[in-house]
Structure formats: C-alpha cells, structure tokens
Amino acid sequence: MNKARPIISGAVGKYYEFQITPDFGQGKVSLQDAWLNVAYIPQAQFQMGKYKAPVNLERLQSDPALQFIQRSQVQNLVPNRDIGPQIWGILFNKRLTYNLALMNGVPNNTSSSDFDVNDAKDFNGRIFLTPFRSSENQWLKGLGAGFGATYGHECCSTTSTYKTWGQTTWFKYNSGVTASGVRWRLDPQGYYYWRQLGLMAEYAVDDQALNLISTNKGVLTSQTHNFHNAGYMFQASYWLTGENASYSYVKPRNPFNPFDPFNGGWGAWELAARVSNVSNQTRQFQLGYANPSVSAKTATEFAVGLNWTLNNNVKYWFNYALTEFYQGAGTTARPTDLPAESVFESQLQVAF
C-alpha cells in the first residue's frame, strides 16, 4: 500500500485552521503534516508546523490531482516537507500568492525527521501569479507562472540520494561527503490550462557546498567545493471525456454508473505524458565526491499514463515509466551506463 493517510482537519473558531495527516502506508507510520494556520486576513496569514515546503509547483499539487502516481525526477533537487513558520497570503483578487518561510532545512526529496539537530536554517520563498484568472479571455484564463527559492547554511548534514520511479538509487555521494556551507535552490515554474488540455513545466537548480574527507597514502585530507545539479520536467494531459483541465482535482462530468454505461456514465478519462531529467555536475565526479561506476551523471524519465476518475472520490491510475541513464555502472576507469529501468504501476485511490 503506497499511502494510507486519514486526514484530520478543521477550524477552531473563525480564524484558526489545522490539519494532522498521519501516514500508515509502505509498512511504516509517519507524520506527513501537522500545522496550524491563523487567517485573520487572507492577505497575511501565519502558518506554523510541518507542511510542504513552499518551493516546488509539482510538490504542492495535492496527490489526488496528480497526473502520475510518482512525481518527476525534479523532486530529487527540492525539499519535501519541513518544519517552521511562514507568512503567506493571497492578493489582488487571487491573482498573486506569496510565501515567506523560515524552515529547519532538509536534504533534497526528504521530509523533516520532526527533530532539529543543528542551528542551521533555510529561508524559503515563493511567488505565483495567475494574472488572467478573472479574465473573460478563455485562452489566458488558465495561465500561471511563478518562482520558488531556498537559501540556507548547512553544517555537517548528510547528503540525499537520487531515486527513480521504482525507488532505485541512481545517484549518491561517496562516504565522507557531507553538506557543509551555503546551499541554495532556484525553481521557476508554470502551468497552462485550456479546456481539456493541461500543461505544466518546471526547472530546478540545486547548489550546495560539500565537504569531502578522504585518506590519500595515509594522509587525511579535507576539501570543500560548491556543486550545482539541475533538472527539468514537462508534462501534458488531456481529458478524453471533455472535463476542463485544472491544477486541482477534476471531478467527472458523468460519474461511473455500471448499471447505465450507455448514457454517459463512464466517469472521466485522462491521457498524460511527461518527460523529466536531472543532470549532475561533472566536476564532482572528477574530484572524487561521486563514483561514475556507482552513480549516474544523468537520468531521463519518460512517462505515460491513462487515468480513470470514477466519481468525486475514486480514481484509478495506469502509468508506465522508462528511465535511461548516462554512466552509473562498470568501473571507475571505464564507466558504462546503468541498464534502463522500466516500470508499470497502477493505483486505486479513495479520497474523501
């Protein structure tokens, strides 16, 4: 079972909102979300607790609304959930959303362990514009674009590993490598929705200072360098049954009715395709931070999906993903390419 998340949410009085989301999936128990939001005015709200870091567009999209079971390779370059306070708001008749957060700081594609073990912190910021949201122009109404970023100083923390759709590790740093110094991330992002068509694109850059402690001929050496890794994703989707595409969960025009399928009760069917890529800076292999016979320099994922939304609560995904690599096998002197990974995955989700 991939996810089992009974969401407890509500409001205390008029201005206080809360959410607690435990997860019992994958044979373990974890706390995904636990936050309190104070919303006296929509333009300047205050949130505190554990929640999705306000950086990445794909990450911030709710799970039921996703076109694919697994998010793209870009997630290897951005944070997942973190702990801290944020000020955020919605301005100009919902045309602009902003977030300013002070977070504990987590490695890429990971969530906070619920404990802060050092004094280092990350500043997260995001701004997203939907300038034509209230326009009568249907061609521009569904256009949105924004920018997310983080900046922080890491001290002796572990580095993250990069994983495929099938959760195979395709990149990791050598032993003796720790994050030690400034780390920043940039994430330009955008989407476009028009009638049944949906498009989403994102580009992410992760730059961090890494320290390598190694032994050479019995002599202990230490070196610190900055490296940046970059990635992109682009996806397109189309509702075959005529629903209007959206960043939010799409409800079927005609919910599935097995007793009357010939009168339109087939639910909603969506076709989706995605390409995503992460490229690691070559210099970190040359300086001994990573081994090209163990870790790939690049991974490119191609994914297609056919999704069936039966009603307002039930959705079925049928996804296929092919991931190709450059290097990651062989020997250090003569690295070869990792074999491509091919995954077919289906998922039935009940959300209420």
Placement of each model-derived feature along the sequence:
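Outer membrane beta-barrel
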Residues: 1-155, 228-263, 268-286
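Outer-membrane beta-barrel pore domains
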Residues: 38, 139, 149, 157-352
